[in-house]
Amino acid sequence: AKKSVGDLTKADLEGKRVFVRADLNVPLDKEQKXTD
């Protein structure tokens, strides 16, 4: 089942390997600042 980070507890993670996928594809302005 799909969970968000806020749904996880220590018991969910204890003794397990965790893979975190992060989407860093965000729009940037000409000064390289996130615009949205």
From Swiss-Prot:
Gene3D superfamilies cross-referenced by the UniProt entry: Phosphoglycerate kinase, N-terminal domain
For the ligand ((2R)-3-phosphoglycerate), the binding residues are 22-23, 25
Listed GO molecular functions?
A: ATP binding; phosphoglycerate kinase activity
Q: Name the residues that span the membrane.
A: none
Query: Cellular location of this protein?
Result: Plastid, Chloroplast
Question: Reaction catalysed?
Answer: (2R)-3-phosphoglycerate + ATP = (2R)-3-phospho-glyceroyl phosphate + ADP
Q: What are the UniProt keywords, alphabetically?
A: ATP-binding, Biological rhythms, Calvin cycle, Chloroplast, Kinase, Nucleotide-binding, Plastid, Transferase
GO cellular component terms, alphabetically, are:
chloroplast
Q: Keyword Cell cycle: yes or no?
A: no
Question: What superkingdom does the record give?
Answer: Eukaryota
Is Nucleotide-binding tagged as a keyword?
yes
* PROSITE patterns with a match to the protein in the record: PGLYCERATE_KINASE
Recorded E.C. number(s)? Answer: 2.7.2.3
Query: Which pathway does the database say it acts in?
Result: Carbohydrate biosynthesis; Calvin cycle
- Residues in the signal sequence: none
Q: Name one GO biological process term.
A: reductive pentose-phosphate cycle
The cofactors named for this UniProt entry are: Mg(2+)
The family database entries (SUPFAM superfamilies) matched by this protein are listed as: Phosphoglycerate kinase
InterPro entries named in the record: Phosphoglycerate_kinase_CS (IPR015911), Phosphoglycerate_kinase_N (IPR015824), Phosphoglycerate_kinase_sf (IPR036043)
Q: Which family does it belong to?
A: Belongs to the phosphoglycerate kinase family.
What is its quaternary makeup? Monomer.
Q: What is this protein called?
A: Phosphoglycerate kinase, chloroplastic
Q: What species does this protein belong to?
A: Scenedesmus fuscus (Green alga)
